[in-house]
Amino acid sequence: MQEALLIPEIRPERFLDPSAGTGMFISTLKDVPEIHCFEKDRLTGRILSSLYPKSKVNIEGFQSIQPYYNGYFDVVSSNIPFGNTRIYDRDFDRSDDPVRKSSLAAVHNYFFLKGMDTLREGGILAYITTSGIMDSLQNRPVREWLVNHANLVSTIRLPDNLFTDAGTEVGSDLIVLQKNTRKSELTEKERNFIETRIISDSIHINNSYAGLDHIVHTSVSMGKNMYGQPAMNFTMKGVSEPLPNISGSYWHKMWGTILTGNFMKKTCPVPPFPLP
């Protein structure tokens, strides 16, 4: 993704990583004029500040971002945290929108809605996130909210063994959305994104992946997720070698699609985009 953002025609002016760690997502974005990062761990945040002194590093949780930054960023992108960690955000807690209020109960849901708030119209949100966002029945309201406030550009399911070097095997998705609060109808792709279906043994999978399309894998099996619940396990042999080629071509094709909508123009049209 970082390579795609270096293409001159699509280089963003304002980039936000709401869960930056030590800066994996911003490591190649030196030519982006304005980069903001959030990292709540104090030690990691200090390392991040030292590595990227020209970036605006906030050593605090994403929920502390100021209202000034609503509608501000061109791109919001990160490998976001997941789990049932409750977040406190006064504006969300007092909201009349039930999806906003309920998103506070799960950090990954909150990051999607809060990230969307910080984007300008036509801006891009690209998150690596737990597969529970797309597969969980409980998250249907969140998925519906997202595609009613943004165009679904694309999704891709990553292999469970992608992050074994970090000591974890977890199902994850790359979800890409383009903010569009003026849309009046959903595409078939977006309706599929909202719904799930049962495969077997109470295993739910998002309708976007019903034919196992857009899933990076060489093998699939019935097993369990990291919480011990029944799940489909997708793995890829030699994951460290082919994935950069796959993701590189995927991102270049996706950004090419966005370019046709003049994404970087401040008053861009926001058409529905086909899957890459």
Mark where each language-model region is.
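Short secondary-structure boundary/capping segments
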Residues: 91-93, 141-143, 170-172, 191
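Charged, non-catalytic accessory extensions
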Residues: 274-276
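Conserved nucleotide-binding/hydrolysis micro-motifs of P-loop NTPases
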Residues: 81-83, 132-134, 162-163, 181-183
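Conserved S-adenosyl-L-methionine
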Residues: 1-85, 129-132, 175
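Conserved Class I SAM-dependent methyltransferase catalytic core
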Residues: 40, 102-163, 172-176
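Flexible, glycine-/basic-rich loop-and-beta segments that form/coincide
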Residues: 164-272
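Mobile active-site "lid"/loop adjacent to the S-adenosyl-L-methionine
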Residues: 80-111
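Glycine-rich, phosphate-binding/catalytic loops in enzymes
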Residues: 33-34, 54-55, 92-96, 142-145
